[in-house]
Amino acid sequence: MNNYLETTHDVYKEAALTPDIGLCCTTNPIWELPGLKIPQIMQEMNYGCGSTVHARDLANNPKMLYVGVGGGMELLQFSYFNRQKGGVIGVDVVDEMLQASRENFKEAEAQNDWFKSEFVDLKKGDAMNLPVEGNSIDVAAQNCLFNIFKADDLKKAIAEMYRV
């Protein structure tokens, strides 16, 4: 890893272990949809600055990819539109963030009768080499993650999003 990516990894590892509400520049508004309840811990671990996807883009059960899982909030929101096993893929390089999301999905299951953790397939990987087959995704998204990349790494990450 490059030095700046190692530093970022360390910051998000700590944020997974101890939620840091003020970590990001702002907080995203929570999607208000009938029957969707966002657990408090997911809100506290929402380290994005606004979704790159609008709910109207998620018609017809799209297969979705989300890179940089945070506390799992956007994965839960995307699952609302694709209630199928593995219908949403979440990729993160930080093991602790993946584990935090898994734990948060248990709370989401308790609060949302329609949600099952199996709707989300969490994978270890990074944005510049996604562990996802080419042309297998209908909607690929990220939330502020790409803001940290230097130009060459950003080009690789964008190319990967288009590949899948």
What are these regions (language model features)?
Residues F81, N147-A151:
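A short His-aromatic
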Residues A141-L145:
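A short beta-strand submotif of the Rossmann-like class I SAM-dependent methyltransferase core
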Residues M128-A140, D152:
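A short acidic, Gly/Pro-enriched loop at the edge of an enzyme's catalytic core
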Residues N60-N129:
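Class I SAM-dependent methyltransferase SAM/SAH-binding core
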Residues K155-V164:
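A short glycine-rich, Lys/Arg-flanked "PGG" loop and its adjoining helix->strand segment in the class I
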Residues C24-K63, Q77-F81:
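Conserved alpha-helix/loop element of class I SAM-dependent methyltransferases that forms part
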Residues M1-T27:
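N-terminal auxiliary segments of SAM/dcSAM-dependent transferases
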